[in-house]
Regions:
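Membrane-interfacial, low-structure loops and terminal tails that flank and connect transmembrane helices
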Residues: 1-9, 95-98, 102-108, 140, ...
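Membrane-interface helix-loop-helix junctions at transmembrane boundaries of multi-pass membrane enzymes
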Residues: 92-101, 135-151, 330-350
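Hydrophobic, aromatic-rich transmembrane alpha-helices
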Residues: 82-90, 322-337
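Extracytosolic (periplasmic/ER-lumenal) interhelical loops and adjacent juxtamembrane/interface segments
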Residues: 32-69, 245-307
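Transmembrane alpha-helices
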Residues: 91-144
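N-terminal signal-anchor transmembrane alpha helix
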Residues: 10-37, 228-240
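Membrane-interface loop-to-helix entry segments
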Residues: 66-81, 115-127, 174-187, 310-328, ...
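Interfacial helix-loop-helix junctions of multi-pass membrane proteins
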Residues: 31-40, 117-123, 158-181, 239-250, ...
């Protein structure tokens, strides 16, 4: 079947997989927010059981264990959906031996996942990494070949699952940061599949020349703002996976200063202040829910270090830069393309997401890092990155003329200039 043929059900299934991935990222964020990542200490088994056969009474309703095990199960489901998309794409876009080999390869990897040993999963992750790299090369040569996008997504989900498991067994924060970052990239790839398989994408006009694209200034703003958001999410993931609690708990200042000192004497004071605040909150019954489970994570037992404060402050500064850049993108897009243009609407949505995201970040600080708000902060961060990425893709590939209002205003300006001359 042609690469350009449209399948409504394939598109719907891809959208469903994107929604499940978004939920999965939220579940992963909750695991980290509640410091629950090591409540199930083994992998790929769970308390010695096959992960899918863990008795319900060992994880349902148990704080921390429920979040971690549910995250593992949801990740497996997303992996299965991604495998389904890969099989579907290869069945549609290839023929004869190529189709058979590709589908057989996916089915073999699914079968090998039944061998629940860490060595097997690591070997599969290495092979999947090579296949992901090969898929990228094929995508560069033919961006419309969705079978290779699907292969990339399936390869990534295998690597992502193994990284999540190794984070448990190797106890390395760096793996956690990589795991969180790759999740965002995987979400973008999967959403690209959903976008490229949509009827709108098939029927909209592809840009033949640079002149038929959105103005360069609009494309650049979408791209660089998205890149900055991606770097911001890496900063955020690094902060979360330090498992150091909240190094600063006031806003807009930080420890009463615009840029807090990180001298040893001041660090000692910050730690003493945080301990006193934690004790006060505990005395006021603000740290635990009625079941005795923690609700805020002001401290995790680790002392505040200079690197924790520096990272926190850089995160604040980058947030301001993102807000300014996305605001500029919205203004420029409206001026260049008109208020009714698709990219103008998308830029307004993007700005709204950034404002909500900034508000959630502030509340995370002022409310002493409650798990629910911190998790929402992760989710809106993913949505913000995804919106920027889709704006970047659309602005650099579709021929979407400016709205009539924008063209008319530009013509009026030209007429006035000619009359004045």
């Amino acid at each position: 079947m042609s690469e350009n043929a449209h399948s409504t059900w394939l598109h719907r299934f891809a959208v469903f997989a994107v929604c499940c991935t978004f939920i999965l990222i939220g579940m992963g964020g909750l695991v980290t927010s509640r410091e629950a990542g090591l409540t199930v200490p083994d992998w790929p088994t769970s308390f010695g059981y096959n992960m899918f056969l863990l008795p319900l009474d060992q994880w349902l309703g148990k704080f921390g264990i429920f979040e971690e095990h549910a995250h593992r199960l949801m990740a497996s489901l997303v992996g299965l959906f991604t495998a389904g998309i890969a099989i579907w794409m290869w069945a549609r876009e290839s023929v004869a031996h190529t189709r058979t080999i590709a589908i057989t390869g996916v089915l073999i990897t699914l079968g090998l996942m039944g061998v629940r040993t860490q060595t097997m999963f690591v070997v599969m992750a290495v092979a999947a990494s090579l296949m992901a790299a090969f898929s990228v090369i094929k995508i560069i040569s033919n961006r419309s070949a969705l079978r290779w996008w699907a292969t990339l997504a399936y390869s990534m989900v295998i690597v992502q699952g193994v990284l999540g498991g190794l984070r448990v067994t190797q106890l390395k924060d760096q793996i956690g940061v990589l795991h969180g970052t790759l999740a965002q990239i995987f979400l973008i790839v999967l959403t690209c599949i959903a976008l490229f398989s949509s009827r709108w994408w098939k029927e909209s006009k592809a840009a033949k020349t640079v002149a038929s694209l959105a103005p360069r200034v609009v494309r650049s703003h979408f791209f660089y703002a998205t890149l900055l958001i991606f770097l911001q999410l890496i900063l955020g993931a690094t902060m979360r996976h330090q498992h150091a609690g909240l190094p600063v708990w006031d806003f807009p200042r930080a420890h009463g200063q615009w840029w807090p000192s990180t001298e040893e004497s001041m660090l000692a004071k910050y730690n003493a202040d945080r301990s006193a605040l934690q004790n006060q909150l505990h005395a006021n019954k603000q740290t635990l829910d009625p079941s005795g489970n923690p609700t805020i994570f002001l401290t995790t037992g680790k002392d505040i270090q200079a690197s924790h404060i520096s990272l926190h402050m850089f995160h604040r500064v980058t947030a301001l830069l993102i807000l300014g850049l996305v605001l500029g993108t919205a203004i420029l897009t409206h001026r260049k393309l008109g208020g009714g243009h698709m990219l103008s609407t998308l830029s307004l949505l993007w700005l709204g997401l950034v404002l909500v995201q900034a508000t959630l970040g502030i509340l995370t600080v002022l409310k002493y890092k409650p798990a629910d708000i911190a998790t929402l902060h992760v989710l809106f961060g993913a949505a913000t990155l995804l919106t920027g990425a889709m704006g970047t893709v659309i602005s650099r590939s579709r021929d979407l003329p400016a709205c009539f209002e924008a063209v008319e205003e530009e013509s009026d300006d030209t007429t006035q200039m000619e009359a004045a001359s």
